[in-house]
Amino acid sequence: SVLGTDISTITDVDGRFTLKEIPEKAQRIRVKYIGMQPKDVKIRPIMNVTLDLEKKLAFFIQAGVGVSGYNLENNNEDIYGGNNHLYIQGGVGLNYNFSTYFSLQPSVNVVAKGCKNMGRRGSDGQGEITVDPVYLEIPVLIAARFIISDFGRLIFNAGPYAAIGIAGKGKYTDEWEGTSMKFDLFSGDEAVLKRFDAGVQAGFAYEIKHIGFSYTFGYGLLKPFKEWNKEWGATPHNISHNFGLKYIF
């Protein structure tokens, strides 16, 4: 079918087709066949179009880098810092295709997040804390796929995620005493983070055949810290910005 018009045709037994009286403004056609992925191609005098088999399930591996931190919002000048932390992640997942344009994308990822130099000053002293937690994160996203070129697809996705802390160290520095100590983030008497987190993710990706490039924003809905004094300001939440690379099998 010619996009933007009501002109269409069907192929013969050998897969050949002819389109006539195409308007000059028309630029692309869409080729569809049962059980195959549709493809939009630029109109040319002679076209050789190859369709890919439409899979219900497609596994993928992914890796990425990003920045994470906590959305510190307070009017207390004694609370400062919380610089964004550069992190890496990697994982596996699958696309379950409901249709040509919609799919479910569950995945399992190992994600290293955290923040640097979040500090508090007061009459009793001044200290800074850096946290480097590692989570096992499981997002379940709904994706919408749009064919925008002969080979490329634009993907928009969104959905919830759940995460469990599996490792991580923190460091506390006493600025007055000039001393520091390290501790486990999720276990022990000095642990400061809750082990479980959950939130929402949303993003977009561009896929070329088996390769995908993506951006994802994540926002935690649970309180990450075990203790947080209201005098320090609003309770912070996990936030993240991730840039990823995906290979689809």
Task: Describe each PLM feature range.
Residues 61-67, 88-98, 108-110, 138-144, ...:
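Residues on the lipid-exposed face of transmembrane beta-strands in outer-membrane beta-barrel proteins
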Residues 113-116, 188-249:
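Predominantly the C-terminal beta-signal and adjacent terminal strand-loop region
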Residues 2-4, 28-41:
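A short, solvent-exposed loop/turn motif at the edges and junctions
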Residues 73-80, 123-130, 186-190, 227-233:
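Extracellular loop and loop/strand-boundary signature of outer-membrane beta-barrel proteins
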Residues 57, 82-88, 132-138, 152, ...:
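Residues that define the transmembrane beta-barrel architecture of outer-membrane proteins
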Residues 5-16:
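Short, acidic Ser/Thr/Gly-rich low-complexity loop/linker segments typical of extracellular
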Residues 54-56, 97-99, 111, 147-151, ...:
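Outer-membrane beta-barrel channels and translocator barrels
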Residues 48-91:
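Short glycine/proline- and aromatic-enriched beta-strand/turn motifs that initiate or cap beta-hairpins
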